[in-house]
Amino acid sequence: MVRFAWRRRASLRATSSLSLRWRVMLLAMSMVAMVVVLMAFAVYVVISAALYSDIDNQLQSRAQLLIASGSLAADPGKAIEGTAYSDVNAMLVNPGHSIYTANQPGQTLPVGTAEKAVIRGELFMSQRTASDQRILAIHLPNDSSLLISKSLRPTEAVMTKLRWVLLIVGSLGVAVAAVAGGMVTRAGLRPVGRLTEAAERVARTDDLRPIPVFGSDELARLTEAFNLMLRALAESRERQARLVTDAGHELRTPLTSLRTNVELLIASMAPEAPRLPDQEMADLRADVLAQIEELSTLVGDLVDLTRDDAGQVVHEPIDMSEVLYRSLERVRRRRNDIHFDVQAIGWQIYGDAAGLSRAVLNLMDNAAKWSPSGGRVVVTMRQFDPSHVELVVSDYGPGIPPQERRLVFERFYRSTTARSLPGSGLGLAIVKQVVINHGGLLRVEDTAPGVQPPGTSIYVLLPGRPMPVSAYSTLADQDMGEANFQDKIGPAVQVSGKSANFRDSAHVISVDYQSARAR
């Protein structure tokens, strides 16, 4: 049994080591050979049955002709002798056991048990094959018995020739099938060969050029899918290279400044070095802490962007009002000199809680950064339609020029006025990435068009559904109730101005988006 299993595994290894072209060709040959064998067998059986049936018909016709002519009764010897000039053997046995025979040269009509039973009258008729002859025995009404036989050698010769013809034709058919299968396989697998060469080229040279697509069959679709994979790989490498380049550039500046300040601090602490004034020492320490915080923020933003690019989004039901509340608590700790006016509704979204929290926090941070001390930031979350919620974060800062509204969502982009302020240039890029991953839309408008400063309002449209009443009440009870929630986030106010419309607003700047399935 072990030896049999080993042989089976060896056979499987040998089969799997064959190329796809050889396997397809062998499969075609096997199928054609099977069809040829079945067809040859069917032809042989049909022709053989027809020939032997024809011999039986001939014997019966001869017997009926002799019986109908009456010559067997008038002159049986002459009647039987006349059959010698044909291709049959004949024998007549009378009741008195007189026997008349006429045989072909070299042949003798065999008489066996079946024929003897007919002669004795036990059987009316019998047919059988014996000694390469087909024998017919008939018991006549006058108690005579007529036996006629015919040699099967001519028929067997025909069948032998037929076997050879079928063998030769079948072999030629299998050979032609092998050649045709090889040609068809080569032509059919040519696109697969191109795909293989392209994959090897990518692995060897990092060449991501697409493969030409011919036709519209399954292999063409496979080629198109491979080209899509190549394009996605090229875009991923481009994004990775751009991210590494931009990150290196953005990290170099704070690291250089941090190194300079640290070296200055170390030098000032040397035994014989002149001591810096206390105010300068405090400023240096504050600068070092600020630069460390800037580096931490930049690294965190890079990690968030990398995670969003990889598509590692965990979908779970999220209460957006809870996300809004937690983000507001964090941004208030950073900018307690800004007054936040918030109006929120219960809204449930299926998505990434961490990503949405990061996006909302970045929107509020951005609005607070551009607001003067004592300024006001308005945050409104309202139902836009039965399946979408609109989040609006508005400030009354200097605003964003129309020509820069697309650029502010690009990675590391910072306008001329923003370069003097702290930040990595990644905050709004993270917002855009999170909104896209959740199937949302983004647009930018002036908060107060025609007024100086115009301010900035960023509109976010996200899919979802109203928060179920029972679940929302539970969350409210869990977080000290709706009244305490309003006390935490400040009084709820209605944002001034007419309601924004994502489709008909005059100052809409579309940002790249992609649709996503709302869960």
From Swiss-Prot:
It is found in: Cell membrane. The keyword Membrane applies. Pfam families: HAMP, HATPase_c, HisKA. It is a multi-pass membrane protein. Keywords: ATP-binding, Cell membrane, Hydrolase, Kinase, Magnesium, Manganese, Membrane, Nucleotide-binding, Phosphoprotein, Protein phosphatase, Stress response, Transferase, Transmembrane, Transmembrane helix, Two-component regulatory system, Virulence. Residues 48-163 are extracellular. Its EC number is 2.7.13.3, 3.1.3.-. This is Signal transduction histidine-protein kinase/phosphatase MprB. It comes from Mycobacterium leprae (strain TN).
